[in-house]
Amino acid sequence: MEIGTPLFEGAKKLLWLGGGELGKEMVIEAQRMGIETVVVDRYDMAPAMHVAHRKYVVNMLDGNAIKSIIKKENPDAIITEIEAINTDALLELESEGYKVIPNAKAVKICMNRIELRKLAAEKVKVPTTQYGFAENPEEVKKICKDIGYPCIIKPEMSSSGHGHEVVYNESEVEQKFKEAITHARGKSEQVIVEEYVKIDRELTVLTYRYLDDKGVVTKTITPIEHQRPSDVYYYVESWHPSTVDKDIIERAQEYATRVVNELGGFGIFGVEIIVSGNRVLFSEVSPRPHDTGLVTMASLDINEFQIHVRSALGLPTPEVKIVSPAAAHVILANNEGWAPKFLNVEKALQIPGVQIRLFGKPSTYYKRRMGVVLATGNTVEEAKEKARKAASLVLVT
C-alpha cells in the first residue's frame, strides 16, 4: 500500500461521521500515520474537529447533506462514530462504491435493537435474555406476563441505555412504554421487552476484523470490564484486563466472534456481554471503538483507535499485547455552561501512573462526559483506585 502526504494529491483520506471523543482519538491515530482527515458532526467545535484537517457541520439525519459532503471529499473510507446518523444514506453510498467502516448494513443493524437481537439470538444463536417485540402497551403486557415482572422496555432505535425503562408491574406499562419511545435515539415504533436479570459483571469484548494476504482475519482482545450505576445509561469506569473466570472469557469471546463475523466488514466492534450467575449473555454491539475501550490507551500496546484506523485503511494488526493492568474513570460535568474550565489537574497528575484526557467539548450539561482519567498499576485494583482518586480531584466549572 502507498500512503501519500496529507493535503496533497495522492493522500489517503478518512472521513468521520461524528466527532466526539472517540472520533478525536481515531483522528489523532490517523494523523500519526499521515492520513488526511475530515470530520462531520451536528455541532461546531466537536472534539475531533480540533485535530482534523477539515470539518463540516450538518444535520446528521439529513441524508442529502451527508451524501453531498462525501461526494465532494471522496474519502478512501467513511467511519461512523455516532448512532444518530442517516443509515439509508450510508447504504446508498456503499452501493455506489464508497467504503463504509465496518459496512453500512452493520451500522444499520447495530442501531436497531430488534434487528440486532434477531441476528444474535435467532441467526447465530448466542445466548441472550428472554425477549419479545411489541408495538403497543397491550403487547408489552402480554410479553411481561409470559416472561415475568420486572421487565425492561427498550426502544428499537437505542444504545447505551437510552430510553431503557424497568417495568415492575402491569400498571406501569402504559407510562414506561411512552417514555421508552420518547427517549429513543431516533424514530422508534417498536420496543424490545426483555427479562430483568441481576447483572453481576459487565464485559466489553473488543473484536476486530482486518484483511491480510490470506484473507479476512477476526480476532478478539481479552475482555474489558466496566461498571455503570443502575440509575444512569453511561459508563463510569472500566478496567483491563477483566478478572472474570477463564470459562466466562472463552464464552464471551466465542459469542462476540460469532456476532461480529455475521455483521462482517472491517474494523473494531465493542461487543457488550453481561454475566448473571452462571449465564453469559450477549447484550449489544457498537460497530466502532467503544467508550469503555478508552482504557486501552493505557493497557494495550496498540489501542482500539489505532486498530480501527488500520482496518479502515486495509492494514493488519496481527497481534495486540497487554502492557499493564489499567483503569479508566470518567470526568463529568455537574451543570450547564459554555467553555468549561478544569481545576486541580495538577493534583490529579501527582498520582504516579495517571494520565488525563480532556476532550475539548465546548459546552457542558449535567453528567456530560468531559474527560477521562487513565491509570496503570501493578494490579487492576491498584489502577482502579488511582483512577477513581484522580477523577474525584478534577472539577469542571
Curated annotation (Swiss-Prot):
GO cellular component: cytosol
Matching Pfam families: ATP-grasp, PurT_C, RS_preATP-grasp-like
Stored InterPro entries: ATP-grasp, ATP-grasp_carboxylate-amine, ATP_grasp_subdomain_1, PreATP-grasp_dom_sf, PurT, PurT/PurK_preATP-grasp, PurT_C
Residue stretches making up the ATP-grasp domain: 118-313
Pathway(s) this gene product operates in, as recorded in its UniProt entry: Purine metabolism; IMP biosynthesis via de novo pathway; N(2)-formyl-N(1)-(5-phospho-D-ribosyl)glycinamide from N(1)-(5-phospho-D-ribosyl)glycinamide (formate route): step 1/1
Residues annotated for N(1)-(5-phospho-beta-D-ribosyl)glycinamide binding in this entry: E21, L22, E81, D291, K361, R368, R369
Sites where the protein binds Mg(2+): E272, E284
Binding-site residues, ATP: R113, K154, E194, E195, Y196, V197, E202
Enzyme Commission code: 6.3.1.21
Catalytic activity annotation: N(1)-(5-phospho-beta-D-ribosyl)glycinamide + formate + ATP = N(2)-formyl-N(1)-(5-phospho-beta-D-ribosyl)glycinamide + ADP + phosphate + H(+)
Main enzyme class: ligase
GO BP term, example: 'de novo' IMP biosynthetic process
Gene3D superfamilies for this protein: 3.40.50.20, ATP-grasp fold, A domain, ATP-grasp fold, B domain
Single GO MF descriptor: ATP binding
Keywords: ATP-binding, Ligase, Magnesium, Metal-binding, Nucleotide-binding, Purine biosynthesis
PANTHER family per the UniProt record, alphabetical: FORMATE-DEPENDENT PHOSPHORIBOSYLGLYCINAMIDE FORMYLTRANSFERASE
Subunit comment: Homodimer.
Family: Belongs to the PurK/PurT family.
Matching HAMAP family: PurT
Designated name of the protein: Formate-dependent phosphoribosylglycinamide formyltransferase
